[in-house]
Regions:
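A short, well-structured catalytic beta-strand-centered motif of the EAL phosphodiesterase domain
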Residues: 1-23, 42, 142-144
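Conserved, mostly hydrophobic/aromatic
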Residues: 21, 38, 61, 93, ...
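Catalytic-site-adjacent helices and loops of nucleotide signaling machinery
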Residues: 14-18, 27, 124-136
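Bacterial c-di-GMP phosphodiesterase catalytic domain signature
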Residues: 8-10, 67-79, 99-110, 127-170
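Glycine-enriched alpha-helix->loop->beta-strand junction motifs that scaffold or abut catalytic
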Residues: 86, 116-120, 139-146
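Conserved long alpha-helical elements within nucleotide-processing catalytic cores of c-di-GMP signaling
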Residues: 19-26, 32, 109-113, 161
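Surface-exposed amphipathic alpha-helices with a cationic face
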Residues: 46-50, 81-82, 109-119, 165-169
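Catalytic core of bacterial c-di-GMP phosphodiesterases, primarily the EAL and HD-GYP domains
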Residues: 2-3, 30-107
Length: 170
């Protein structure tokens, strides 16, 4: 699988990860516009790989609450997939726990159910940090991506190893 990640080529700081400029994503309008561009690019690239017979399992798109609230994400995703000739097994969607906080939670949950019905894989990214709750395991999630803070150096950290095993056993 491939994951569509966004990086900013800053003129003085070089390549900057999205995590280092979260204030951009606090503006829902800007976040939604960026989300549309990233989704379109990722799906276009996946279609090109299919056309060129490049083997890949799926491309995963990280989405924000703004994508669901302002972009009608499930409907737009279905339309773009059809336009690019992509099947549900070619596309994954990644969400984080922050999307389920506040007044956008209902829109996000409804949208996730729609995406799940389409047959696209839904992953819960960075699970185990922040406000993650066992209640999140009841969401229409196909895959948990345990946060790297638990898996980095796991072979030397029995506590983190036990936590990861417990999550996997769930």
């Amino acid at each position: 699988s491939f994951e569509a990640l966004l990086r900013w080529q800053h003129p003085t700081h070089g390549l900057v990860s999205v995590g280092l400029y979260p204030q951009v994503f606090e503006n829902q309008g800007l976040s939604a516009r960026i989300g549309r561009l990233v989704a379109e690019f990722a799906l276009s690239q996946a279609a090109q790989w299919l056309h060129d017979d490049v083997p890949f399992a799926r491309v995963a798109i990280n989405v924000t609450a703004a994508d669901f609230v302002l972009n009608a994400f499930p409907e737009n995703l279905a339309e773009r997939m059809a336009r690019h000739g992509l099947l549900p097994q070619h596309v994954g969607v990644e969400v984080t726990e922050g999307m389920f906080l506040g007044r956008t939670a209902v829109s996000v949950l409804s949208g996730l159910h729609d995406i799940h019905k389409m047959g696209c894989e839904i992953s819960f990214d960075d699970f185990g940090t922040g406000y993650a709750s066992l209640m999140h395991l009841k969401l229409p999630i196909d895959r948990l991506k345990i946060d790297r803070s638990f898996v980095t150096g796991i072979e030397n950290d029995p506590t983190n190893a036990a936590i990861v095993r417990a999550i996997a056993d769930l």
